[in-house]
Amino acid sequence: MTFSDYMDYLRGKRIGVIGFGVSNQPLVRVLLRNGCDVTVCDRRDRAQLGATGDEAAAQGAKFILGADYLEHLDFDVIFRTPGVLPIVPQLRKAAQSGAILTSEMEAFCNLCPCRIIAITGSDGKTTTSTITAELLRAQGYTVHLGGNIGTPLFDRIPDIRPEDFAVLELSSFQLHSMHCAPDVAIITNISPNHLDVHPDFEDYVSAKCSIYRGQRPDGCLVLNAKDAHTPRFAAEAPGRVRYFSSIGPVENGVYCTDGVIYRAHDGKAEKILDATEIRIPGAHNVENYMAAFAATDGLVGNAACVQVAHTFSGVPHRMERIRELNGITFINDSIASSPTRTIAGLHALPKPPVIILGGHDKHIPFDTLGDEVCLHAKAAVVVGETAQRIAAAIRASKCYDLGKLPLVEAPDFRAAVETAYGLAQPGDIVTLSPACSSFDLFKNFEERGNTFRAIVESLQ
């Protein structure tokens, strides 16, 4: 089905758009521009929607707003926001009544005229997606990068050519019950996450599986050789499977051994580059590069791989150096919204840091994080909803030594940053690496990182 055909199909149907956030605003504009009957459903009130709400109203949108925004979903087609899973009772009831449940991203995947490389996982999605896009661009392709990375693509479909590439970062919320058939899919890793939204861990894992379930036999799935869930994913994959590995050679894929990264085809290896040539630090970023190399194998040559490795300086809020003050270096790793990501950041730093931890409670365990903080941090400052849980995990660790690891609970975010600065000495590192999402105090991890930057820049 073409984009034009899809607009013809939707015209005349009652369309509900659940959530009026970043991804659904351009969707609403496109639907209204094409003469569709659109109702925006959002928990905010009319004033909170601001200028974008005024624009939609001027184009003919209707609204169901406030706390009961999910109670009257009498529509033929419903586009849900990623944050509202299709398993919520109101959406289930709507589906049982005949409504078609979809999303901006599912519609994009089904209508996109070019090849799609889709990336999911618990950690490293944005960096891997960005590296993949940079590799393709270095090879001369036109690339459309979007999805969970923050750039909606639905309204760009008419401008996408068959010879282009779409690189999509997909979250478990986007993938839940979604049908997609990417030409290449990557799963970076799997660890417990978002258990405040998913009913259980299996539901979270199953959502991730949607990235490959609809692939064609000629599709390719790229998997992490050391992840415990990889055998299951490989067995279920409809198409070819390639691996990226930091634990030894693989028959087909990309691996790193003795500090050298190779690509392998049927066991025959070819050097791509030395791991030390990668500009951004950390073993986890070597893995992100290997995943991207595996996904673009046959599309991107070694020269482009080396060029990107030498020049790509990373994505904001990911091990981002903010400033040095009185000999103390401040690192913004606000994206670290899970324990595994924070642990990877600790291992990437050249010395034990003063670490700022805590945020929104996603109901995931902190036991391993407690051990790693005791082993690899100089001091810890905890803040937010999870402050007491993280502090308890640190104190419960068999590695905990009160005399060696100062542990402070801060009353607010500014106090956390100022306390961390006070605990540091010249030559030390202070890192914001929360191991939690930001929604207790901030709209998103970007706002948290920007607030950290502003506080750090105000320090004397």
Regions found by a protein language model. Name each.
Residues 31, 78, 119, 148, ...:
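Residue-level signal for inorganic ion chemistry
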Residues 3-14, 24-34, 142, 273-379:
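Nucleotide phosphate-binding/pyrophosphate-handling subdomain across enzymes
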Residues 1-103, 107:
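N-terminal leader/targeting and accessory segments in enzymes
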Residues 52-54, 59, 367-427:
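C-terminal helical cap/extension that packs against the catalytic core
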Residues 38-42, 145, 167, 243, ...:
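Short beta-strand "acidic-cap" motif of Rossmann-like dinucleotide-binding folds
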Residues 37-44, 221-225, 356-357, 376-385:
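Short internal beta-strands
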Residues 33, 71-75, 82-225, 229-240, ...:
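Phosphate-binding loop of NTP-binding sites
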Residues 39-43, 64-67, 102-106, 238-256, ...:
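Beta-strand->loop->alpha-helix junctions that form or flank phosphate-binding loops
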